[in-house]
Amino acid sequence: MANNQASLLLQKQLKDLCKKPVDGFSAGLVDEKNVFQWSVSIMGPPDTLYEGGFFNAIMSFPENYPVSPPTVTFTSEMWHPNVYSDGKVCISILHPPGDDPHGYELASERWTPVHTVESIVLSIISMLSGPNDESPANVEAAKEWRDNRAEFRKKVSRCVRRSQEML
């Protein structure tokens, strides 16, 4: 039953995004037969180091969505403090509901069933605009962000260039 409700909700969210696209990203299904796997393209936000980039990601939804959050994994190269080396995005709203066992996040910052694909992607765009280096997924990127901005910029520029070459 939950699987069917999740499927219907995801179909509705995809339909809504197609009817009313949001600036900065596009979304579609990886496979027309599987509404639980989405392909997402995010444009690097203006006036950021990621500007001009076209970054692809896979959004994977659990069968109990929206009770539990999806995972988002960049398939494009990404150098960012809040993205693991395997491309998995680490932001508060993608963390399971409840208290943070590490004490970094308030429960109110974590996943709630009111979030949508749109709110998730807007949070990722915001993450690209301003990294959180307090609890990084990529410690090396966070260290560069804090201590060696020129090297950080160089690596991000390479990611942007490579994303453009993939078009």
From Swiss-Prot:
Domain UBC core, chain residue ranges per copy: 5-165
Catalytic activity: S-ubiquitinyl-[E1 ubiquitin-activating enzyme]-L-cysteine + [E2 ubiquitin-conjugating enzyme]-L-cysteine = [E1 ubiquitin-activating enzyme]-L-cysteine + S-ubiquitinyl-[E2 ubiquitin-conjugating enzyme]-L-cysteine
Protein name: Ubiquitin-conjugating enzyme E2 14
InterPro entries with a match to the protein in the record: Ub_conjugating_enzyme, UBQ-conjugat_E2_core, UBQ-conjugating_AS, UBQ-conjugating_enzyme/RWD
Similarity field: Belongs to the ubiquitin-conjugating enzyme family.
Gene: UBC14
Pathway: Protein modification; protein ubiquitination
Any one GO BP annotation for this protein: protein ubiquitination
Catalytic residue list: 90
EC number in record: 2.3.2.23
